[in-house]
Amino acid sequence: MLSIRNLYKSYAFADSRQSVLQGLDFDMEPSTSVALRGESGSGKSTLLHLIAGLDRPDSGEIHFDGRAVHAMPESALAAIRRSELSLVFQQFHLISTLSVLDNIRFQAALCGRQDSAYERELIERLGLAGQEKKLPQQLSRGQQQRVAIARSLLHRPKLVLADEPTGNLDEKSSLEVMALFSELVRQAGSSLLMVTHSRAMAAFMDRRVRLQNGVLAEDE
C-alpha cells in the first residue's frame, strides 16, 4: 500500500543546508497502523508531508497504492488527498463558519462519498450527538478533536496521516480519544501512520518504528 525507497529531503537556510531524511526505506501494508517516533528534527512530520504530496523529496521514490506520488503533478496529488487520504494534526483546521455536522461532512462531500448511516455511527461513537448544530468554537478542545476524527474517517480513506493528533489534550483525554480513534480506523479498513512522542499512544498501533539521523533505526 505504501512503499518508500531511498528517500532524501533537505532544507536550505540562510547559510547552510540541513538534511532531514537521508536514504529512508519504509513499507506499510494495507489496513495496518504504525506509530512513527523519533527526536524532534528526525524527519517524522516531513515524511508525512512528503507522502501527502504537500512537499517534494530531493530524490527517492514514494509509491502509494502502486502510484508514484513523488512524480505526480499537483492536480493528481490533490485528487488523492481529497478522496484517499486524511490528515489529522494537532491543529484541527475546523471551519469556524460551518456547523459541527457540516465540518464532519466536508471532505466526504468533496469526493462525493456521503454515507448517512456511517455519519450517524461516527457521531454517536464519538460522543457528538446533540452537538451537530453548534459551531466548532463552541466546543471543548476534546470535542473539536472528535469532530476532526469524524471528518477524517467519513469518506473511508485508504490512509490516515496523523501528527500528534491528541497533542493538545490532557493525558486522560488523549488516551480516551486515541483508543477510540484507533478502533474506528480499524473498523473503517483504513491504515494509520501516526507521529507521536508518547509510548502510551504508540502502544495502540500494530507496529512502532523510530527515525534517527534520517533513516529507520528501529522497527517493532
Regions of interest found by a model, annotated:
Residues 2, 8-204, 208:
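ABC family nucleotide-binding domain
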Residues 208-220:
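H-loop (His-switch) and adjacent beta-strand-loop-beta switch element
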